Amino acid sequence: MSRATKIALLDYGMGNLHSASKALSAVGAEVSITNDPKVVAAADKIFFPGVGAMRDCIAGMHEAGIDDVIRQAIFNKPVMAICVGMQALFEQSAENGGTPCLSILDGTVPAFNPEWKDEKGVQIKVPHMGWNTISGMNFEHPLWNGIEDKAHFYFVHSYYCEPADSSQVAAICDYGQPFCASILQDNLFATQFHPEKSHTAGLQLLKNFVDWDI
């Protein structure tokens, strides 16, 4: 019997750690909630959560030393980031008039424009909160195994990622205009939506990450 995949769930004072830990455990992972670089180094994979204000997230990461941990881990093991964790990978967020991020990926994080309109001509509400569909996935990639086109996932965000390299976009969502719902670059995978809150499809995606063999 093969051993469970060890996942370091990064704890820097932000993120719904309990929900993420419970969901990852439910799909067979051995989860350690940690900010200890030694525990992270010993893990098979890294899970990078995030909710709340970007400025607070970046400050929390720096104080806990998680920013350096992420930069080191990104080169040698699979990493999955969600929501603000995904946004933090880029260079700068528009939040608070401009907040520097980790600059692991080139690109920015602009705000949704409340003047945008949906397909019915109704102005969108900000934040984008609730269920929405994603599309444009490469279904030959194992991370999307068992996920259908137009699958529903749960979103809560006022900002969205604009990667400088469009080849990193792994899925799109539409909210007033199409935006990047997921990125994939080598061993780095990230989603704007919350898989741990997305029921069957979310658990399938987390299982795919746990099983992902690069």
UniProtKB/Swiss-Prot annotation:
Its pathway? Amino-acid biosynthesis; L-histidine biosynthesis; L-histidine from 5-phospho-alpha-D-ribose 1-diphosphate: step 5/9
Q: Which SUPFAM superfamilies match?
A: Class I glutamine amidotransferase-like
CDD domains attached to this UniProt entry = GATase1_IGP_Synthase (cd01748)
Domain Glutamine amidotransferase type-1 positions: 6-214
The active site of this protein is located at C83 (nucleophile), H194, E196
Cellular compartments annotated: Cytoplasm
An example of a GO molecular function for this protein is: glutaminase activity
Which Gene3D superfamilies does this chain map to? Answer: 3.40.50.880
For this UniProt record, the keywords arranged alphabetically read as follows:
Amino-acid biosynthesis, Cytoplasm, Glutamine amidotransferase, Histidine biosynthesis, Hydrolase, Lyase
Give the catalysed reaction(s), semicolon-separated.
Answer: 5-[(5-phospho-1-deoxy-D-ribulos-1-ylimino)methylamino]-1-(5-phospho-beta-D-ribosyl)imidazole-4-carboxamide + L-glutamine = D-erythro-1-(imidazol-4-yl)glycerol 3-phosphate + 5-amino-1-(5-phospho-beta-D-ribosyl)imidazole-4-carboxamide + L-glutamate + H(+); L-glutamine + H2O = L-glutamate + NH4(+)
What is a single cellular component term in the Gene Ontology annotation?
A: cytoplasm
The biological processes this protein is annotated with in GO are: L-histidine biosynthetic process
Query: Has UniProt tagged this entry with the keyword Cell division?
Result: no
Q: Does the keyword Hydrolase apply?
A: yes
EC number(s): the record gives 4.3.2.10, 3.5.1.2
InterPro entries given in the database record: Class_I_gatase-like (IPR029062), GATASE (IPR017926), Imidazole-glycPsynth_HisH (IPR010139)
Assembly and oligomerization: Heterodimer of HisH and HisF.
Q: What does this protein do?
A: IGPS catalyzes the conversion of PRFAR and glutamine to IGP, AICAR and glutamate. The HisH subunit catalyzes the hydrolysis of glutamine to glutamate and ammonia as part of the synthesis of IGP and AICAR. The resulting ammonia molecule is channeled to the active site of HisF.
Name this polypeptide is given: Imidazole glycerol phosphate synthase subunit HisH
Record organism: Psychrobacter arcticus (strain DSM 17307 / VKM B-2377 / 273-4)
**Gene, per the UniProt record:** hisH
